[in-house]
């Protein structure tokens, strides 16, 4: 479980544009084990590679109307560890949209 470089796509529907930025996020493997069949009532905690600390960076999205805030702030991982996925701050699903997904049509 460690920091890795990634390109993510940021978008604001009101601006009609997507912007690619370089960031870091956590990826890799964490030690896991299956539940003991002799003691099924004891559940094992399965750790995921997640961030310990993040900072926030801001980028200006082009093409915004005057009445729209053109700035987009996004998290960048600074440190990683194996732990529980916090669904309050993290998308813990397997079927999330990819980091390069843009819902706006690109010419």
From Swiss-Prot:
One of its GO terms (molecular function) is follicle-stimulating hormone activity. Disulfide bonds join 1-49, 15-64, 18-102, 26-80, 30-82, 85-92. One of its GO terms (cellular component) is extracellular space. It is found in: Secreted. Glycans are attached at residues 5, 22. Heterodimer. The active follitropin is a heterodimer composed of an alpha chain/CGA shared with other hormones and a unique beta chain/FSHB shown here. Belongs to the glycoprotein hormones subunit beta family. This is Follitropin subunit beta. It comes from Aquarana catesbeiana (American bullfrog). The gene is fshb.
